[in-house]
Amino acid sequence: MTHPLVPPITDLAIPVAEQLGLEVVGIVFHTNQRPPVLRIDIRNPQQDTGLDDCERMSRALEAALDATEIIPDAYVLEVSSPGISRQLVTDREFISFKGFPVIVSTSPPHEEQQEWIGQLIRRDETKVYINQKGRVIEIPRPLITRVLLYDGE
């Protein structure tokens, strides 16, 4: 369940990231820790996300959060990159990672196979399309449990 502060934090974080040329790809507020930890995952769409990107976002977002007082108590802000092994969810991510290697998991199995590895072609309303050694594989979306970027390991 999403913490009730995540939507207003998201509304604040997205424009801050956009001003820096970055994208917010995930926000989690861990309130089971003392102090609570606000974790923001970012991506630089122009190049590999680096430490400098995380530092710039951290400084800018910290100032914005402090100014709005969305989080009334002490907290720890962590800004990081989600890394290569991450799940594709939004249409924007499927467009951004076209041509990248992915692993598509299905349940129940599609054509007697539960995991498919190939180059991402696209996603439409009904299917995800991947290229597997020159052959286009069409996987019905209702069967897909997740699509992850694949790093070959």
Curated annotation (Swiss-Prot):
Protein family per UniProt: Belongs to the RimP family.
Pfam families documented for this protein: RimP_N
Descriptive protein name: Ribosome maturation factor RimP
Gene Ontology biological-process entries: ribosomal small subunit assembly; translation
Protein source organism: Nostoc sp. (strain PCC 7120 / SAG 25.82 / UTEX 2576)
GO cellular component: cytosol
InterPro entries: Ribosome_maturation_RimP (IPR003728), RimP_C_sf (IPR036847), RimP_N (IPR028989), RimP_N_sf (IPR035956)
NCBIfam families: PRK00092.3-3 (NF000935)
Keywords associated with the record: Cytoplasm, Ribosome biogenesis
Keyword Iron-sulfur (UniProt): no
Disulfide bridge positions per record: none
Principal localisation: cytoplasm
Subcellular localization(s) per the UniProt record: Cytoplasm
Keyword Transferase on entry: no
Function: Required for maturation of 30S ribosomal subunits.
